[in-house]
Amino acid sequence: MRADIHPKYEKLVATCSCGNVIETRSALGKETIYLDVCSACHPFYTGKQKNVDTGGRIDKFKQRFAGMSRSIKR
């Protein structure tokens, strides 16, 4: 086996925009990274997720194009 072919696996500090700090290890090559969202502030993990009502959107689409019909002239 060849020696020294793997990247260095070092400590990494990930800082979220909400202020949450996560310490982990990575071969990224950086000491710190900045995140937009993390498990402490993401709506899915915090339970503040909003469901989009697609049924109303489909009904609105059908209503908009209900009067149109395909007329093929031969």
Curated annotation (Swiss-Prot):
Ranges in coiled-coil conformation: none
Superkingdom, taxonomy of origin: Bacteria
GO MF entries: metal ion binding; rRNA binding; structural constituent of ribosome
Annotated positions binding Zn(2+): C16, C18, C38, C41
GO cellular component: ribonucleoprotein complex; ribosome
Keyword Metal-binding among UniProt keywords: yes
Biological process per Gene Ontology, one example term: translation
Matching NCBIfam families: L31 (TIGR00105), PRK00019.1 (NF000612), PRK00528.1 (NF001809)
Stated role: Binds the 23S rRNA.
PANTHER family: 50S RIBOSOMAL PROTEIN L31, CHLOROPLASTIC, LARGE RIBOSOMAL SUBUNIT PROTEIN BL31A
Subunit structure: Part of the 50S ribosomal subunit.
Family: Belongs to the bacterial ribosomal protein bL31 family. Type A subfamily.
The protein, known as: Large ribosomal subunit protein bL31
Organism of provenance: Acinetobacter baumannii (strain ATCC 17978 / DSM 105126 / CIP 53.77 / LMG 1025 / NCDC KC755 / 5377)
Gene: rpmE
